[in-house]
């Protein structure tokens, strides 16, 4: 196969490269258009974390609800329950292992966090990133030296259906999220608030 590839004329290889990797500006526009198709969804999700050597560190299952512009709730059930929830103003992060709730304003959420980028999806957000894509797979690299990640991979189809999210951390740990979207409309009476469990330690950072 490699021999055959070497025999291809240079201009064909160049054309294939251009086809496979759209320009950064084109990729950014395509990704933004697809994310704009997402208004809300409910999905089951599988999470897998691997170390820099590829060993599986953790596997879990959960659920996630997202409703633009800034409503979301996610629950991971194993190995212990973790909940992240926002009512549009307040962000709650609950860790059942330590029985601790961390509270913050949603406006203070890190601007380059993957969830923030997917929900907000505005032009200003993508100016801080280099983006390339091959078909439905988008590779996102931060221009900031102090970014919270090295690379994000988003797989989203032309209908705006989110399939996968892969986050490569600065320590070379990878977190894989596989989505199985069940609904694209969330009821208006769905509760995005979080009820703090009795006896939980509260770390209020507002």
UniProtKB/Swiss-Prot annotation:
<protein>
    <recommendedName>
        <fullName>Outer-membrane lipoprotein carrier protein</fullName>
    </recommendedName>
</protein>
<dbReference type="InterPro" id="IPR018323">
    <property type="entry name" value="OM_lipoprot_carrier_LolA_Pbac"/>
</dbReference>
<dbReference type="GO" id="GO:0030288">
    <property type="term" value="C:outer membrane-bounded periplasmic space"/>
</dbReference>
<dbReference type="Pfam" id="PF03548">
    <property type="entry name" value="LolA"/>
</dbReference>
<dbReference type="InterPro" id="IPR004564">
    <property type="entry name" value="OM_lipoprot_carrier_LolA-like"/>
</dbReference>
<keyword id="KW-0813">Transport</keyword>
<dbReference type="GO" id="GO:0042953">
    <property type="term" value="P:lipoprotein transport"/>
</dbReference>
<feature type="signal peptide">
    <location>
        <begin position="1"/>
        <end position="20"/>
    </location>
</feature>
<dbReference type="GO" id="GO:0044874">
    <property type="term" value="P:lipoprotein localization to outer membrane"/>
</dbReference>
<dbReference type="InterPro" id="IPR029046">
    <property type="entry name" value="LolA/LolB/LppX"/>
</dbReference>
<comment type="similarity">
    <text>Belongs to the LolA family.</text>
</comment>
<keyword id="KW-0732">Signal</keyword>
<keyword id="KW-0143">Chaperone</keyword>
<comment type="subunit">
    <text>Monomer.</text>
</comment>
<comment type="function">
    <text>Participates in the translocation of lipoproteins from the inner membrane to the outer membrane. Only forms a complex with a lipoprotein if the residue after the N-terminal Cys is not an aspartate (The Asp acts as a targeting signal to indicate that the lipoprotein should stay in the inner membrane).</text>
</comment>
<keyword id="KW-0574">Periplasm</keyword>
<keyword id="KW-0653">Protein transport</keyword>
């Amino acid at each position: 196969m490699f021999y055959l590839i070497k025999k291809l004329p240079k201009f064909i290889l160049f054309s294939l490269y251009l086809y496979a990797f759209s320009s950064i500006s084109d990729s950014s526009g395509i990704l933004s258009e697809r994310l704009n198709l997402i208004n809300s969804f409910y999905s089951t999700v599988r999470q897998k974390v691997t170390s820099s050597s590829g060993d599986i560190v953790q596997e879990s299952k959960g659920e996630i609800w997202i409703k633009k512009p800034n409503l979301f709730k996610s629950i991971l059930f194993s190995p212990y329950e973790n909940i992240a929830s926002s009512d549009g103003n307040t962000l709650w992060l609950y860790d059942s292992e330590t029985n601790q709730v961390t509270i913050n304003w949603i406006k203070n959420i890190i601007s380059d966090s993957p969830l923030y980028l997917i929900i907000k999806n505005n032009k200003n957000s993508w100016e801080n990133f280099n983006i390339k894509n091959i078909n439905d797979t988008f590779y996102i690299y931060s221009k900031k030296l102090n970014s919270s990640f090295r690379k994000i991979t988003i797989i989203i189809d032309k209908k705006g259906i989110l399939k996968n999210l892969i986050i490569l951390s600065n320590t070379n740990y990878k977190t894989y999220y596989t989505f199985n979207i069940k609904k694209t409309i969330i009821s208006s009476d769905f509760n995005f608030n979080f009820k703090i469990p009795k006896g939980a330690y509260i770390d209020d950072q507002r």
